[in-house]
Design a protein with these regions (language model features):
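Short, surface-exposed helix-loop/turn micro-motifs enriched in polar/charged residues
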Residues: 4, 21-25, 41, 69-72, ...
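A non-catalytic, helix-rich entry segment at domain boundaries
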Residues: 1-32, 36
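Generic recognition of stable, solvent-exposed alpha-helical segments in well-folded globular domains
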Residues: 3-10, 28, 42-45, 57, ...
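Metal-dependent nuclease catalytic regions and adjoining charged, substrate-binding loops involved
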Residues: 85-165
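Non-catalytic protein-protein interaction segments used by genome-maintenance enzymes to assemble
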Residues: 28-88
């Protein structure tokens, strides 16, 4: 436990140094959102940080994982951009000019950024629709794994966790 506390402290110190050196124009933190795709898929969540930049708005998602990944392949970031691109009742709207994964443990290159095009966002929307349809039709082969520990749905609709009566 002490080891993790020390790691957390060091991560926060490094993050604070970076922010002080290059302060962002933060317009929202933990920004709640809720929207639907085709009025039958409902998505909600919170965007870690939204900044105002010279080029528009920028979405940042903080990550504590040890292995950095590419923003371009991150569906979570794309969902944030999808929401903002179609938001009408929010004070913050419009397709973000960039979206970034901020890897807090990464000292050299903490950011992985990507600007999602409209075509990419439409592709993500179609992927979500296809996955949702397959889930509704029970056309998937769920695989139990370590990731199941964080799944909110395992006891609601996952066949791998159904109890036999």
């Amino acid at each position: 436990e002490e080891k993790f506390r020390e790691q957390g402290k060091n991560i926060l110190i490094e993050y604070a140094k970076r922010i002080i050196e290059n302060p962002p124009t933060v317009i929202s933190r933990e920004h709640p959102f809720e929207f639907s795709i085709n009025n039958n898929i409902f998505i909600r969540g919170k965007i870690d940080r939204i900044d105002q930049t010279e080029n528009g708005i920028s979405v940042i998602d903080y990550k504590t994982s040890k292995t950095p990944s590419l923003a371009k392949k991150n569906i979570q970031l794309a969902v944030y951009c999808l929401y903002l691109s179609q938001a009408v009742e929010d004070k913050i709207t419009g397709t973000p000019s960039s979206s970034s994964l901020y890897f807090l443990r990464e000292l050299e290159e903490p950011l992985s950024s990507h600007s999602f095009s409209n075509d990419e966002l439409n592709n993500i929307k179609n992927i979500i629709l296809n996955i949702a349809e397959k889930i509704r039709q029970n056309l998937f082969d769920p695989k139990k794994g370590y990731h199941c520990n964080w799944c909110d749905y395992k006891h609601l609709l996952c066949p791998k966790f159904e109890t036999k009566v």
